[in-house]
Amino acid sequence: MSNYVNDMWPGSPQEKDSPSTSRSGGSSRLSSRSRSRSFSRSSRSHSRVSSRFSSRSRRSKSRSRSRRRHQRKYRRYSRSYSRSRSRSRSRRYRERRYGFTRRYYRSPSRYRSRSRSRSRSRGRSYCGRAYAIARGQRYYGFGRTVYPEEHSRWRDRSRTRSRSRTPFRLSEKDRMELLEIAKTNAAKALGTTNIDLPASLRTVPSAKETSRGIGVSSNGAKPELSEKVTEDGTRNPNEKPTQQRSIAFSSNNSVAKPIQKSAKAATEEASSRSPKIDQKKSPYGLWIPI
């Protein structure tokens, strides 16, 4: 009973200890609440930061896509894509270093169709090609590979070693010498001394030589023209072609024979110079009735 009274008495130790226990429980609750609030705040801040980063990445991606589209359109529809800002610095350096002028940057029409379909600009490739040619190297294809040139151009490999652009031509004297050498070689190979040359290889005397030969005649008169072949095997160029003779046909003889005109008829025809029947009109010449 005394214990019961002591417990219920206002000054008992149980009543003194009860508020301390309530205070400890409240503090634990407050700490848990503060922890949950701080965790929620940190999660919110983390989500905000992640959303910011994601929005920034999306914006950057959209900007890069728009730039790519713009560049593609610019490459398709513009001819001055090679003069972009990204490569202006390298060109300025090349101008200072190698002394290029602006005519190397303008590519000809044959390279423009290729460069539009490729990602590389035409100005850089053409500039590299011009620089390689200037240094004596050969530029292969549309890429950047440059190989040293093994042989020089065909113009530099001429017999006379001249750098002129005109092709090499032989003079008449050189041709005659080569023809004589070929004759001797053919005679040795065939074992014959006299070789009949074709008409294309026979030499025709020039007009000066023929005029000199006519002027230095012993009698002072021009030599008579004949159908004899010269020593080289060609006819004399000064001789005139003979007149076409008329042909007579007969039923007894099937072989056509030319008609022999009398001297009187020949003189009359030569004096008049206008025959009664025009031979040029008829394709078969003069026809004589039998």
UniProtKB/Swiss-Prot annotation:
InterPro entries: RSRP1
Chief location of this protein within or outside the cell: nucleus
Entry comment on modification after translation: Phosphorylated. Phosphorylation at Ser-107 and Ser-109 mediates the interaction with spliceosome proteins.
Localization annotation: Nucleus
Biased composition (Basic and acidic residues): 150-159, 224-238, 266-281
Keywords associated with the record: Methylation, Nucleus, Phosphoprotein
Chain intervals with Basic residues compositional bias: 32-123
A Pfam family it matches: RSRP
Biological processes, Gene Ontology terms: spliceosomal complex assembly
Tissue: Expressed in brain (at protein level).
Described function: Probably acts as a spliceosomal factor that contributes to spliceosome assembly and regulates the isoform switching of proteins such as PARP6.
Protein name: Arginine/serine-rich protein 1
